[in-house]
């Protein structure tokens, strides 16, 4: 075999550059998760209006909440995993205080611009009263489901919540994160502008969802 016909030996390529590129791409995602789960590291000039829930409470199994759609079909809140959820609870007749929460949630959602698809709105109804047509029309796009108040109490109010205080469910607006954890509670009679700003900050600071 002559020198001209001998196979050329190719040097082995190092995987190091490829590994470094992969790690560089992964680093911001890892950092986002770490910062998200450590709110004390968030910028101090960005004080939350809502109250962070510590420890966060995961969405229970479907059977534990017993959620059903308005036409009686089972509904799993975890089907919305991957989205930030604005959640409120009230009676089907939806008095003015209820409509105000739905209004705040809808406007906070609509105001998120390019991030609008990262959010979902859920209203949990605690009785069998029919929902007024004007509410159904005004808040299209809100997921409306029913559940018993006692099934919601521990998840939304915590294990120490009074067992006979169903009215405590009717005031706040809550936030469930894209990983399926209840993580933020807005106060009764929340200020709509402050809620919207908090949601904007959450979406800005988080790469999840």
Language model region names:
Residues 169-209:
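Thiol-/selenol-based redox modules, centered on thioredoxin-like
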Residues 122, 127-171:
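Short, internal strand/loop/helix patches
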Residues 16-36:
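Hydrophobic membrane-insertion alpha-helices, especially the h-region
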Residues 102-122:
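Conserved helix-turn-beta segment immediately C-terminal to the redox Cys motif
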Residues 77-105:
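Short active-site neighborhood of thiol/selenol oxidoreductases, capturing the structured segment around
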